[in-house]
Amino acid sequence: MGDPEVLLEVYEVIRNRIEERPEGSYVAELTEDDDTKPAINKICEKIIEESGELILAAKDGDREGVVYESTDLIFHVLVLLAYLGIEIGEVFDEFERRRK
């Protein structure tokens, strides 16, 4: 099984890309307002898209597709959290609170 620490690493990379905005960065582009859409709309639309793809993969019994689309969905949720300034630790804390 993979190391769950990778979520923290990916989150930090996302935060860094939002802050430093390197040219050619997908995250930097996604989290920047443009002439047609505010960044929050672009991020939320990606979450909707990835959710739908995950649901279809699950419905089709596509195990690899579920893993792939889950990764895409989680990635975009991490982008949303970072964009909104929500630390991933806050989500972990909520999981711990609910576990009790």
Curated annotation (Swiss-Prot):
Similarity-based family: Belongs to the PRA-PH family.
Top-rank taxon: Archaea
Reactions listed under catalytic activity: 1-(5-phospho-beta-D-ribosyl)-ATP + H2O = 1-(5-phospho-beta-D-ribosyl)-5'-AMP + diphosphate + H(+)
EC number(s) given by UniProt: 3.6.1.31
Class of the enzyme per the UniProt entry, highest EC level: hydrolase
Claim: Nucleotide-binding is one of the keywords in the record: yes
Full protein name: Phosphoribosyl-ATP pyrophosphatase
Any one GO cellular component localisation term in the record: cytoplasm
Transmembrane stretches, start-end: none
HAMAP family (alphabetical): HisE
One BP term from GO: L-histidine biosynthetic process
PANTHER family named among the record's database cross-references: HISTIDINE BIOSYNTHESIS BIFUNCTIONAL PROTEIN, HISTIDINE BIOSYNTHESIS BIFUNCTIONAL PROTEIN HIS7
Pathway involvement of the protein, from the record: Amino-acid biosynthesis; L-histidine biosynthesis; L-histidine from 5-phospho-alpha-D-ribose 1-diphosphate: step 2/9
NCBIfam families: histidine_hisI (TIGR03188)
Molecular function in Gene Ontology: ATP binding; phosphoribosyl-ATP diphosphatase activity
